[in-house]
Amino acid sequence: MHPRTFSKHLRHAGIVAAIQAAEQKTTGQIRVCISPRHTDTPVAAAQAEFLRLGLDKSPARNGVLIFVAPRAHKFAIIGDEAVHAKCGDAFWRELADVMSGYFRKSEFTPGIIHGVQKAGELLAEHFPSPRLGGMKS
């Protein structure tokens, strides 16, 4: 699917609201990238975008990127070192499976929002916002 066509089907305000709600509860950062390029290696492309966005610069190493490449019909979810240490591969695989189910039904916005919400829950549990009285783990 062409990225512009894909982007037109997204409810951007809903995705932004989900990111804002998730980030209110954590010191972590969540980003969503819709790539205009075709990629056969979504994980490598996501890792490059993760670095380009500076998500690796957080002192707590608690950033998450949901990277979607509509031209290739692929996506990847990248969590920084500290996030991955808290959840391991199983969390990412399960999240990717659920998001894939949404995407197969062309429910792109709900799929991305689900990913944002689950990443936010993980971040809030392990990297809570001090504004909410939480302490970093």
Residue ranges and their predicted role:
Residues M1-S137:
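A structural boundary signal for the start of the first folded domain, especially the loop/turn
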